[in-house]
Amino acid sequence: MAYLRWRRFTELASLDRPWLGELFMRKRNKPIVAAPVEKWDAEYQDGIYDRLSRSEQRHHHRLLAAVIADRWPNPRVLEIGAGEGVFYEALRAHRPARYVGVDFSRPAVERGETRLAPEIAIGEVKMVLGDGRTFATDETFDVVVFSECVEHLGEVEDLVAHYAPNLKPGGAVGLTMWLALKPLRLWHRLKVLGEVLDEAVINTPWGGGWLIAVVRPKI
């Protein structure tokens, strides 16, 4: 318990003191490597991620959805790394005008199509099989969301540049990230790419923690 408290203290302190995170980071020179799609496919088929639908696992989704809707009523949202569209279920209460969810796992997308079938039928929602690093569309959005996936999508600067053309004027990038020292490196890099409109941290009694943020890139 003492270690967990110390770790959370260090994570929170490193939000505005990057040097502190570097000091205490384990395996700081080992890059984050994304798991192959076959692993994700198998885990979705086995129901490993069913737990992500539980209420205690979705506080960060609800907060990010509310923050987005506060700035962009009836928002148009593109989510990269959408899995089976769990974030949309938090966004639904805010009556989004359009939601496109992209994931490279076919089982995840198929489950999302089943989960969100009523909204798909009326054209409000679209689930797409695609690689989040290279996905392309002619649609524009108020917000492009990366929920707990940005660390698996390559260089954050390249990622933001790739999706900048899909942002409407005044649009932004939305982010949720597990509160851990190595992923926070990417948050520090993302912050300097634009204006931070919102930033918050969620802690839970069971020990979970997330960063949520909205950043308007300099385009």
Language model features with spans:
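A short acidic, Gly/Pro-enriched loop at the edge of an enzyme's catalytic core
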Residues: A136-V144
